[in-house]
């Protein structure tokens, strides 16, 4: 029997990445009742332990680019609770930030599957609990699409913009001359640690990436156990959303190929 739960709130936030988390916490502190719908079981999106793309990278080299506000608040709490900078503990820091706000109802492991409108006004969104098998119908005065891929636009036929804008579009002198469809790509999380076993034969589906990796990094002298492989990214020049399965296959093959290449040339053995 289908279990449907109806929820009323002031603001429904779709997506629990850093933008969705900040939107939910800020709104809750302003007194709004918030429902946060996140299709993963951890918060943070690409900054979570699932992908491990650390936030505020520019601030490491240029202090004036360091973000303040809620991001700084999270960074300070992370230093206090997580001095070893462990990503699993970072997940806990983000989770604590949300559950500490009594005005937020988090729905983790729930994915947005539809929306209803009255004219051009969104009245509710539908979500599906991937583990609980609960269906949620969330009614709100306001909705924030922080999914990263404009998932609500798919359900309500809203106009969206994708790609890189031109200089003339918003008066940005540092933008490119012509707009195009280039977006962020897809990746998969890869980490290496020093092992004790002799290098194993490469898997049959891998390729030798010696030339391509060496072009970017000194294979023999890099600290591979501290590398997060942010440069393994695919699909930005394609439809990174609707062709995600294809790009996932490419990313997995590239990850194992890079690992085999490093094992071959680095001088140390690594476990993946």
Where are the predicted features?
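Beta1/beta-strand and adjacent pyrophosphate-binding region of the FAD-binding site
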Residues: 4-17
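Loop/turn elements at helix/coil->beta-strand transitions in domains of secreted/extracellular proteins
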Residues: 8-11, 30-33, 101-105, 121, ...
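Active-site-proximal beta-strand/loop segments in catalytic clefts of secreted hydrolases
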Residues: 14-17, 37-40, 109, 128, ...
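N-terminal Rossmann-fold NAD(P) dinucleotide-binding loop
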Residues: 20
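Conserved N-terminal/central alpha/beta ligand/cofactor-binding core
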Residues: 26, 32-33, 37-116, 161, ...
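Flavin (FAD/FMN)-binding glycine-rich loop and adjacent Rossmann-like elements that form
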Residues: 46, 109-112, 121-124, 131-142, ...
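Helix-loop-beta segment of a Rossmann-like dinucleotide-binding subdomain
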Residues: 76-85, 124-126, 238-241
């Amino acid at each position: 029997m289908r279990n449907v739960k109806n929820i009323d709130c002031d603001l429904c936030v779709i997506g629990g990445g850093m933008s969705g988390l900040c939107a939910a916490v800020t709104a809750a502190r302003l007194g709004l009742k918030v429902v946060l719908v996140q299709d993963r079981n951890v918060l943070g999106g690409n900054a979570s332990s699932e992908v491990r793309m650390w936030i505020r990278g520019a601030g490491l080299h240029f202090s004036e680019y360091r973000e303040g506000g809620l991001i700084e608040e999270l960074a300070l709490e992370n230093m206090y609770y997580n001095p070893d900078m462990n990503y699993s503990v970072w997940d806990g820091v983000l989770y604590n930030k949300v559950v500490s706000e009594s005005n937020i109802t988090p729905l983790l492991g729930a994915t947005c599957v539809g929306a209803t409108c009255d004219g051009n006004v969104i009245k509710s969104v539908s979500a599906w609990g991937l583990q609980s098998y609960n269906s949620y119908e969330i009614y709100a005065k306001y909705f924030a699409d922080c999914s990263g891929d404009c998932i609500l636009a798919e359900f309500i036929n809203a106009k969206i913009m994708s790609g890189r804008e031109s200089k003339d579009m918003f008066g940005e002198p540092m933008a490119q001359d012509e707009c195009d469809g280039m977006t962020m790509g897809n990746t998969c999380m890869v980490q290496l640690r020093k092992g004790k076993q002799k290098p194993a034969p490469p898997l049959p589906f891998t390729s030798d990436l010696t030339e391509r990796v060496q072009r970017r990094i000194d294979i023999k002298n890099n600290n591979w156990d501290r590398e997060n492989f942010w440069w393994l990214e695919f699909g930005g020049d394609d439809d990174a959303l609707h062709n995600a399965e294809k790009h996932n296959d490419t990313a997995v093959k590239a990850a194992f190929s890079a690992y085999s290449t490093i094992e071959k040339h680095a001088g140390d053995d690594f476990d993946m």
